[in-house]
A protein has these predicted regions:
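Double-stranded RNA-binding/processing signature
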Residues: 1-230
Length: 230
């Protein structure tokens, strides 16, 4: 990766690395190392470290700012650090433009894969932690990840809607909801699923997402509103 590209990314992150090699390593996917002898290390160790730093920073922020029970705080934290949310932040930062991939991974759309983007975001956090300490990595997390919390709370994305719908349906009509694929489209690396939530043969709602599980949760959230089951 060229020095200008690294400089451009640092400008987007509002940070300047003392050790540029750490940022470079954070962007190296395992597949790239297999094809390039000069890339001695990939980013999985940094991802491991960044995951821990991320969890601490998010946990501390939620504890300090939300007087909620442990269970409620855990739900919010899980929604913040889940792969799809981290991937969305990575896309906003255009991290996919800078990831170093093998030719095969590149062809399969690796730059758009949510899990790969999320892992790279965590690796960058780990690199910042090693280069500049906890305060700098926490600052990045608060600046780029925490703004997603408003949407999570407003849209109840931290709530397990499927469990709530099941409880309400069993209590009201004695039936467990089921889910069916209504439509599946898009390339392998960027699938879109539309799932329907049903009670018996009645379609309550449809929801969409990048995985069946995500689409089912979306359908369940809409079904709860449709049935007026708060």
């Amino acid at each position: 990766m060229s020095a200008p590209a690294l400089s451009e990314l640092q400008s987007q992150l509002s940070i300047e690395f003392k050790d540029q090699k750490l940022l470079y390593e954070a962007l190296v996917h395992r597949s790239y190392v297999n094809e390039h002898d000069e890339a001695a290390s990939h980013n999985e160790r940094l991802e491991f470290l960044g995951d821990a730093v991320l969890e601490l920073a998010v946990t501390n922020y939620l504890y300090q700012n939300f007087p909620l029970s442990e269970g409620e705080l855990t739900l919010l934290r899980s929604a913040l650090v889940k792969k799809d949310n981290l991937a969305a932040v990575a896309k906003n930062l255009r991290l996919g433009d800078y990831i170093l991939l093998s030719k095969g991974e590149e062809k399969s759309g690796g730059r758009e894969k949510n899990y790969l983007l999320a892992n790279t975001f965590e690796a960058v956090i780990g690199a910042i932690y090693l280069d500049q300490g906890y305060a700098a990595s926490e600052k990045m997390i608060l600046e780029f990840l925490l703004p997603t919390l408003d949407t999570i709370i407003a849209e109840n994305l931290h709530i397990d809607a499927k469990s709530s719908l099941q409880e309400k349906a069993q209590a009201s009509v004695g039936v467990t909801p089921t889910y069916k694929v209504i439509e599946e489209s898009g390339p392998a690396h960027d699938r879109l699923f539309i799932m329907g939530a049903y009670i018996n043969d009645e379609l309550l709602a449809t929801g969409q997402g990048s995985s069946k599980q995500q689409a089912e949760q979306a359908a369940a959230r809409i079904a709860l509103v449709t049935k007026q089951w708060p």
